[in-house]
Amino acid sequence: MSIKSKNKLRQHRKIRIRKKIFGTADQPRLVIFRSNLHIYAQLVDDITGSTLLTTSTLSLKDNGINIRANKSGSTLVGKEIARLAIEKQIIKIVFDRNGYLYHGRVKAVADGAREGGLKF
């Protein structure tokens, strides 16, 4: 399967998922973006269209943590987004895998967020 068709299928899955899930200020949407070098996680309030919190392997590297975008690094990103959310009294979230399969790095972010104290 070519890269173009793989990305096109992911975009169709993304649209299908976004029709069903919705984040609010009390229960924001945790969105995952995966690139070859980094993984990003952000909490989004869909009512106002604003990003409440964000973290990534890139921001953790800036803080002095030696991290890569593998499963262990993704778990750390999940724990960090959970820590930041709990500081803002956000406990419940809606998980948006952004069209990616719930496997590998995406699952590791979700598991890290659960370990950090977030409820899906």
Swiss-Prot record:
Concerning CDD domains, the annotation shows: Ribosomal_L18_L5e
Q: Which InterPro entries match?
A: Ribosomal_uL18_bac-type, Ribosomal_uL18_bac/euk
GO MF term set: 5S rRNA binding; structural constituent of ribosome
Q: Which domain of life is it from?
A: Bacteria
What NCBIfam families does the database record attribute to this sequence? L18_bact
Q: Per its database record, what is this protein's job?
A: This is one of the proteins that bind and probably mediate the attachment of the 5S RNA into the large ribosomal subunit, where it forms part of the central protuberance.
How the protein assembles, per its UniProt entry?
Part of the 50S ribosomal subunit; part of the 5S rRNA/L5/L18/L25 subcomplex. Contacts the 5S and 23S rRNAs.
**Similarity remark:** Belongs to the universal ribosomal protein uL18 family.
Q: What is this protein called?
A: Large ribosomal subunit protein uL18
